[in-house]
């Protein structure tokens, strides 16, 4: 009986479980800016991530270990080293970088084929919406062929890491899905 109440309490208000979330995407998409926007609520000066940044965030009564992995071509093959025990992937796309949308789509779908990520929820940030010429979230969704993702919870959110727009809404959706499906 106690286990039933404990389980219900955890589902409603969170648990002490630590969740691993990966922030992935091509170089220059805004991954590190999003990470630190989530952690400290402001924009910090960043440089290209060679390797990774990892921060622990408390959000909605959950402890999130958020791994921001570099997106350069030479680093992407190493993403798979971080897939184990991942609850969710945040994939960040530079909505102004139309020339690399097909590369972003290829990398996204390759990654999602990995067995270790089969149960991971996916949040896509169509980032840099504050920039002229940015594709809308629905246009980015089409470019990434997100409609092909049949057996996975996913969402795409228009965002501007610099202005802080869309970040909280996206993370709220992600945490709700994780609580519903994995906790």
From Swiss-Prot:
A single GO molecular function term of this UniProt record: GTP binding
What the entry lists under InterPro entries is as follows: P-loop_NTPase, Small_GTP-bd, Small_GTPase_ARF, Small_GTPase_ARF/SAR
Quote the disruption phenotype from the UniProt entry.
Decreases the physical interaction between MON2 and DOP1.
Q: Which UniProt keywords apply?
A: ER-Golgi transport, Golgi apparatus, GTP-binding, Lipoprotein, Myristate, Nucleotide-binding, Protein transport, Transport
Please tell me whether the keyword Disulfide bond is annotated for this protein: no
Coiled coil stretches, renumbered: none
UniProt cross-references to PROSITE patterns, sorted A to Z:
ARF
One Pfam entry for this protein is: Arf
Any S-S bridges, and between which cysteines? none
Residues bound to GTP: 25-32, 68-72, 127-130
Where does it mainly reside?
Golgi
Please give the subunit comment from the record.
Homodimer. Interacts with IMH1 (via GRIP domain); the interaction is dependent on GTP. Interacts with MON2.
Q: What is the protein's name according to its record?
A: ADP-ribosylation factor-like protein 1
Q: Which organism is it from?
A: Saccharomyces cerevisiae (strain ATCC 204508 / S288c) (Baker's yeast)
* Taxonomic path: Eukaryota, Fungi, Dikarya, Ascomycota, Saccharomycotina
């Amino acid at each position: 009986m106690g286990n039933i109440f404990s389980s219900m309490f955890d589902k409603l208000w969170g648990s002490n479980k630590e969740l691993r979330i990966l922030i992935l995407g091509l170089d220059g998409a805004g991954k590190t800016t999003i990470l630190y926007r989530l952690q400290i609520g402001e924009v910090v000066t960043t440089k290209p991530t060679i390797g990774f940044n990892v921060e622990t965030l408390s959000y909605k009564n959950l402890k999130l270990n958020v791994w921001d992995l570099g997106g350069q071509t030479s680093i992407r093959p190493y993403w798979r080293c971080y897939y184990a025990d991942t609850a969710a992937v945040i994939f960040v796309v530079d909505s102004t970088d139309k020339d690399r949308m097909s590369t972003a789509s290829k990398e996204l779908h390759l990654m999602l084929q990995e067995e270790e990520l089969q149960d991971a929820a996916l949040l896509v940030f169509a980032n840099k919406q504050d920039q002229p010429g940015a594709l809308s979230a629905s246009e980015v969704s089409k470019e990434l062929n997100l409609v092909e993702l049949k057996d996975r919870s996913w969402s795409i959110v228009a965002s501007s890491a610099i202005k802080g727009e869309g970040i909280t809404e996206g993370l709220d959706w992600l945490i709700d899905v994780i609580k519903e499906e994995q906790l």
